[in-house]
Amino acid sequence: MKTSILILAAGLGTRIKSQKPKVLQELCQKSMILHILKKAFALSDDVSVVLSHQKERVEKEILEYFPKTQILEQDLQNYPGTAGALSGFEPKNERVLILCGDMPLVEQTSLEALLSNNAKLNLAVFKARDPKSYGRVVIKNDSVEKIVEFKDANTQEKEINTCNAGVYVIDSRLLKELLPLIDNNNAAKEYYLTDIVKLAKEKDVMIKAVFVDEDEFMGINDKFELSIAENFMQEKIKKYWMQQGVIFHLPQSTFIGADVEFVGECEVYENVRIEGKSKIINSIIKSSSVIENSIVENSDVGPLAHLRPNCELKNTHIGNFVECKNAKLNTVKAGHLSYLGDCEIDSGTNIGCGTITCNYDGVKKHKTIIGKNVFVGSDTQFIAPVKIEDEVIIAAGSTVSVNVEKGALFINRAEHKMIKDYYYKKFQK
């Protein structure tokens, strides 16, 4: 049975206390709404998102990554509440999966389990450790009797710890029939989607409660809950990669972005941060190193190294206090304390301590190209644009501002001067 998916993301999110809309808050470098959309499009090609607060800003991000998403706008003034969000929604398929925009931890497998039940109305519920302000779910004889919003619950109902996860699967025809019957006769004067359960019961519709994991279906309302959710997501990411064969030393100290990929046998030491769409292939990343949007293949990086965006390393050693940016290094050794930016360095080349590619002239960035089997002495500066051909020796302390031909020795030093007995003349008068 085909499914249409609707994601509710129109709320103000005032408790998040941010100028950025709640659904654009990031976990593991990806906004909440993008995490949910990735799972939604894995299940259906008919996905809609309901927006209102900062609609243009949220819509721009959604369509950048998921251009096939249908965007709807909720009239919060006239139709507030979760049921009001469905006004104007026209599903293309036989049933509808309704999700919340602040649930980035939900797994695709859990949604598939929810969809595997063929009841006309399925409701995701969980046993809450601390029910707090969740809506309470009353279940009798394996069927949901009603959902009571916390604001409207009596003392007895507040004792119930079976709570509404806010995720529904409903027959499209049933939704179309019941939605116009929902009213706003409640304390908040809102149109509650939860009322659809009461209306379905009045029509003797079987409502199936599907129990799910509380942590996975947690909604995020403030920055504290955001941090909890990110911790859960980090644990999932690292557990997955460890099951694929990656070794993490002290994994709790390491940050791995949601889009990072590991291939083959990799080893990651403590306090490492790997971001963006980085790809690590058969490599070792040592302590306290940072890698941003870079590819590392058959190499070792660190400790205390920094690969800024667009680096490509192959068969290369990057040591401590080396920073690279937009650098392509193939079979290179850069052991310590260097900046290699906007450069290409070929096989067999050794970069001495204190080497700098001076790539910026105050207006534009320029490139340094270094060939094969080049020996670069310590404390060398390359004034880009500059090209060093194969099998060159650059003497320590040189400033290279011209191209160097193959096989040459390049030396550029100020003439030394030594004044005899100067110390005694200055201090022992």
UniProtKB/Swiss-Prot annotation:
Binding site for UDP-N-acetyl-alpha-D-glucosamine: 8-11, 22, 81-82, 135, 149, 164, 221, 308, 325, 339, 350
Cited SUPFAM superfamilies: Nucleotide-diphospho-sugar transferases, Trimeric LpxA-like enzymes
CDD domains: GT2_GlmU_N_bac, LbH_GlmU_C
Region (Linker): 224-244
Protein residues bound to acetyl-CoA: N359, Y360, S378, A396, R413
GO molecular function (one): glucosamine-1-phosphate N-acetyltransferase activity
Swiss-Prot/TrEMBL GO biological process terms: cell morphogenesis; cell wall organization; lipid A biosynthetic process; peptidoglycan biosynthetic process; regulation of cell shape; UDP-N-acetylglucosamine biosynthetic process
This protein's GO CC annotations: cytoplasm; membrane
Gene3D superfamilies noted in UniProt: Hexapeptide repeat proteins (2.160.10.10), Spore Coat Polysaccharide Biosynthesis Protein SpsA, Chain A (3.90.550.10)
Pathway the protein acts in: Nucleotide-sugar biosynthesis; UDP-N-acetyl-alpha-D-glucosamine biosynthesis; N-acetyl-alpha-D-glucosamine 1-phosphate from alpha-D-glucosamine 6-phosphate (route II): step 2/2; Nucleotide-sugar biosynthesis; UDP-N-acetyl-alpha-D-glucosamine biosynthesis; UDP-N-acetyl-alpha-D-glucosamine from N-acetyl-alpha-D-glucosamine 1-phosphate: step 1/1; Bacterial outer membrane biogenesis; LPS lipid A biosynthesis
Catalyzed chemical reaction(s): alpha-D-glucosamine 1-phosphate + acetyl-CoA = N-acetyl-alpha-D-glucosamine 1-phosphate + CoA + H(+); N-acetyl-alpha-D-glucosamine 1-phosphate + UTP + H(+) = UDP-N-acetyl-alpha-D-glucosamine + diphosphate
Listed PANTHER family: BIFUNCTIONAL PROTEIN GLMU, NUCLEOTIDYL TRANSFERASE
The protein's name in its UniProt record: Bifunctional protein GlmU
